[in-house]
Amino acid sequence: MKRILIAIIILLSSAHYINAQVETPTMGWSSWNTFSVNISEDIIKGQADAMVSQGLKDVGYQYINIDDGFQYGRTAEGKVRIHPKRFPNGLRVVRDYIHSKGLKAGIYSDAGDCTCGSISNGDTRNTNVGFYGYEQIDADFYFKELEFDFIKVDYCGGNHAGLNEKEQYTAIHDAIVNTGKNVRYNLCRWAYPGTWCHDISTSWRTTGDIYNGWASVKGILDENLYMSAYCYGGCYNDMDMLEVGRSMSEEEDKTHFGMWCFMSSPLLIGCNMANIKEQTLSLLKNRELIALNQDPLGLQAYVVQHHGETYILAKDILSLHGKTRAVAFYNPSDREVEMYLSFSEVDLGGQVTVRDLFEHKEIGTMEKGMSVSVPPHATRIYKLEAETRLDRYIYEAETAFMHDYQEIYNNQSAGTAIYEKTSSASGGVFAGWLGGRRSNSLEWKDVHIAEAGDYTIHFAAASKESRSFNVVLNGEELRRIVVQTTDWGVFKEYDITVPMNAGSNAILLYNENGWMPNIDYMSIEKSGENTILNRRLEETIGQLEMVSHNSLLTNKLRQNAEQLIKKATAGNLLNSQIKTLLKDSKNLLNTINQLIPTCIEYHYWKNYSDKNIEASQESTPLNTLKTKVERCETSFLIATTQNQISTAIKSLKTALTTYFHEESAMPKEGEQFDMTILISNYDFSSEDGWKGEPTYRSGCGEEFNKTFDLHQILTNMKPGIYTIKCNALYRTRNNDAGAAYKAGTENIQAYLYANEKKVKIKSLYSETWPNASLFSSSDNLNGYPHSMHAANIRFAEGCYQNELQYSHTERGTLQLGLKCNNYINDNWCCFDNFELHYQATKDYYDGITSVQHSEQTAQNDTYDLSGRKYTDDKNNTKEIVIKNGIKILR
C-alpha cells in the first residue's frame, strides 16, 4: 500500500531509524476550504490551470484534490453516481485534464454510509455514497476505472453508522491494495486514530477541521507539538488544509505555512489559486521552507525548549545525526518575545552558520547560541550548519513513541497512555497512564551514541505510590526500576549504567502487570563524565545573559540574573554547586516568564502616563502626578514579585484617574488628554464594565436582533470638550447587499451617544471590503462582514471609525455608549475599541492668554474663565477663576 520512492531500510526488531529517503508529504490543492460542496468541472479545471500558471507546480505542488460534493447517490449496480449538474461530463474527463497538466488527481469519500456534506451542508444526494458496504466497488471505481492518485476518507458517515475506525479504515485499505494501484490514502478522523493507522495509510488527520483564523492555527499546532514520534517511514501527521492567503495577518500566515512545512504536514492549499495575492503566492512558493517539508528524511520537528508561551523546535535535515539542522522559534503569544537558543540544546558545537529561511539570507556565523526577537503570533525558521555534532543528552518523554497511543477514546477508559502538561516537568509535559500490559509502553527508537562504551542513563519519574517499570535496551531486558516520590508531579532521577552500542539504540520502558510511574525524561552521559551538568550550565548561562539585558524587566530581576551568571562563570564549581545554581536559575527564569506580561502592562501604563504628562500644562496637580509616577517607577525597578509589580500598576492608574478629575489639571493649548483609562473594558478584552447585555467574543462586542443600550456612566467629569471614538458597524436587518444603503433609504436608528448628544452608527455597507472574497460564507456575506470575527478583522484595519464630540458644561456625569430604541429582525451591531479624549474650551485658553497679557500691570488681579477681571462682590457665589495664571476656587 505504501509507495516507496527510495528503498527504506528498517530494523524491524526495534524499528530503528536509518538514514534513508522516504516518500515525502503530499503537496497540492483541495477544493473544500474555498468551495465547500459547491464545486464543478470548470472550477476544478480552473484550479489545475492556476496551479500551473501561478508557478506552484514548479515548486512541488502536484495534487488537485476533489473534496466532497461530486456525488449524486448510487446506480442500481451500486456504483457512485456523479452529480449531473456539477460534473455533466463525469469525473474521467476532469481526471484526464488534471493529468494532462502533469499533475495528479485526488478524490474524496467517507468510511461510512454518507459524507460530511450531506450532514452539515445540506447536500442531501450525498447519502449512501460512502465506502461502507461498497469497499471494493468504490475502490475499483476510483482507482481502476477513474485512476485517481489520492483519496481522503472522512468519518461523518462512519460515526453515523456506528462503525469501528480501525476495522473500517483497514477494510478500505485492503480494498485499495486489491486494485493493485499506488494510492495515497489519507484518514480524516479529526484526532490521532492510533498507532495502527501507520500500517494502512500515508497520512492521518490529528485534529478537528481547520478554519480561517489564528485561534485555529494555534490550536492545531498545540495538538501537534508532541507528535514527532508518530511521523516516520513516509507516513505523516496531517494538520489539515492550508488557510494561507485568506484573512490572517502576514505573520500569522508565515507561522501557519512555515510550521506546516517544518512539521512535515501535507501541504494542501485551500484558497482560490486563480486570484491568490502576490504576498501569499510568494510565501507558498518559498523553496527553502518547502525543502524542509520535502526533506528526504521525512521527520517531524520536536520541541527542544519551552519557556512561558514560546517554543523552539528542531529536526535533522538531509542526513540523520549530521551537522545540519533546522530550528523554529515559535511565539504563539500576544506579545513580542526575545528568545534565546543555546546551540547545545540542538546538539551542535563549535562555529555555527545561520541562514534565515523566510528571508533567504545568511545571518552569520555564531558560537554558543543565538537570540531572536519574535513578534506575536510569529515564527522564525533557520538552517544551522555546525562544525561538530554532539550526542543528544536529554530525551523528553514527549518525544518517545507510546505503542498504544490514541486520541479517539477516553484514555482512562481505554487504558492507553497520554502526554500530559505540568509545570513541574522538564519540558512542561510528561508521559502518563503507562503500563497495565506490555503494549502500553514507552520507547525512544533512535538513541544515538557516537562512541560505544558504558553510559549512565537517568530516568526522571514520579509516583505517589510505589510503581515500577522494566528497561529494555536493543531488545535485551536490563532491570526493573521501582519509583516512589512525594507526589505525582514531583520527579526524581533513577539511574542505571549499561554498555551501549555506537550508532542507533532503542530503549523501551514497560510494565505488563501494573501501572507505571509518570515519566518526564531520560538523560544519558558517558560514565564518569559530567556532560549533562556542564551542558545544562552552558545553556542556562545563555538564558540568564539574555534576561540580564531585557529592558522590560525590573532592575532587581536583572541584577539577580547577573549575580547567578557571576557564580556560574567563576570556574572550578563542584557538582553540588552546579546543581544549586541550576535550581536557582530555573526558579528565577520561571519567575521571570510569569512576570514578563505584568512588566509589559506596567510599561504600557507608564508610557500612557508620560504621554498625558507631556500634554499637560503646568499646575500643582501635575507636579503631584509627576511625584506619584516617579514613586511608581522606583517601586517597579526594585520589584521581584507579581504583587509588587501589580501594585505599581494600580498606583499608576489611580494617580492618573485622580489627576484627570482635578479642576486645574488641563492639557496645553492644542493638546488633549487621553482619558480612555476612565472607560472600563474599553477594548472588550473581558466581560465586565458595560451595562446592557452584549455578547463578548473574538475580541469585540455584539448586539443582535434586539433593542439595546450598551453604556457606562462616568462620574465627576469636569467641564470641557470630550471626544468619544469607537469602531462600530450597524446592519438594520438581514443582509441585503446594501440595497437600501445605496438607494439612500436605509433607516439607521442606532447611535453612538454621550448624554443627550448622539450620532448614527456607521452602516455595515458604508465601507467596501477589498479582501471579502478570501473569506468563507460564515464570515463574508455579499462582500460584507458577517461575523464578529470578520468585524474584528475590519476594526483592526481601522475601519468603521465612529466619532462624537460633546461639550460638557458643568461637572457631573457623562453617560456614553451605543443604543438602539427601534429594531427590525436580524439587526446587528458589532463594536470595539472605545476611546475618550478631553480638551479644554477655547474660553479657557483665551482666559489664560488675557491673564498673561495683564500680569505686567496687574499681578494680583483675578479673572474669570473668560478673561474678565474679577471684582470682589460679596454676593457672588464661589467659582473657578484664574489668578496669576493659575486656576483657583473663589
Identify the role of each PLM range.
Residues 128, 134-137, 167, 182-272:
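Glycan-recognition surfaces
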Residues 260-263, 268-270, 306-348, 377:
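Carbohydrate-binding surface patches
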Residues 6, 847-890:
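C-terminal outer-membrane/trafficking sorting elements
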Residues 361-387:
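Intrinsically disordered, low-complexity Pro/Gly/Ser/Thr-rich segments with frequent PxxP/GP/PP motifs
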Residues 43, 47, 51-162:
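Aromatic-lined carbohydrate-binding/catalytic grooves of carbohydrate-active enzymes
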Residues 337, 348-351, 379-535, 539, ...:
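Extracytoplasmic
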Residues 25-31, 60-67, 104-109, 149-154, ...:
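Structural recognition of the beta-strand scaffold that forms the well-ordered cores
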Residues 529-572, 586-639:
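Amphipathic, heptad-repeat alpha-helical segments
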